[in-house]
Regions:
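Accessory carbohydrate-recognition regions in carbohydrate-active enzymes
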Residues: 31-211
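N-terminal export/ancillary region detector
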Residues: 21-22
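Single conserved hydrophobic/aromatic residue that forms the stacking wall/gate
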Residues: 1-15
Length: 211
């Protein structure tokens, strides 16, 4: 039987603890990917007067056909999301390169409870950044007035939405295609919604439509 001295036992314990800490640190960092360090909200504290920030929190895959974003600005406003805002008007599909060039082929989706409100001013809902999570691959926010949570995950061409409503019979989803030339049709028997938006900021063909 080989007996270790007190000094040797202390060294073995220290080495074991050191190895465990290193292993734990490795697994902690191994779980994170580079995309997890991206904060889409950076640069969104935009001010038109200074032309600073001028970004929006894109929820999208690299080179995705469409980007998605929470919308705090009015319909057609190039500054569609500003960090200082406290109301969300919808969740928008966007192709916007900059606020000055503005957007094209956009539409928005807005869930709500209670009384149905179509107008963008009336349907706008309070939210807090404390109840908002933004990453390039996942977005969620709690809409306090409607007591519901919206979640978005992008795909190459579209996005998955999940709305968690409270128990109520008065739950709605408003689809806003912005312009009068746009078209939306609900087909209940097929669980399908089809349509297109004609919204643009110029430089498109006369028959432009985003289906």
């Amino acid at each position: 039987l080989h007996l270790l001295s007190r000094r040797q036992r202390q060294m073995c314990i220290r080495d074991s603890l050191g190895g465990a800490l290193l292993l734990g640190t490795y697994f902690l960092f191994a779980q994170k990917q580079p995309v997890d360090y991206v904060n889409p909200l950076m640069g969104t504290d935009s001010k038109i007067s200074l032309s600073n920030g001028n970004t929006y929190p894109a929820i999208a895959l690299p080179w995705g056909m469409n980007f998605w974003m929470p919308q705090t600005g009015k319909m057609g406003d190039g500054w569609a999301y500003t960090y200082a805002s406290d109301k969300i008007r919808g969740f928008k599909q966007t192709h916007q390169p900059s606020p000055w060039i503005n957007d094209y082929g956009q539409f928005s989706i807005m869930p709500m409870t209670g009384r149905l409100r179509i107008d963008q001013e009336q349907r706008a809902c309070w939210f807090s950044h404390k109840a908002e999570k933004a990453t390039p691959y996942y977005y969620s926010v709690y809409l306090s007035e409607y007591n519901l949570t919206t979640e978005i995950a992008p795909t190459e061409r579209c996005a998955y939405f999940r709305f968690t409503f409270p128990e109520t019979k008065d739950a709605y989803i408003v689809i806003d295609a912005f312009d009068r030339g746009s078209y939306v049709k609900v087909i209940p028997e097929e669980n399908k919604i089809v349509g297109y938006t004609t919204r643009n900021s110029g430089g498109v063909p006369r028959n432009f439509k985003n289906y």
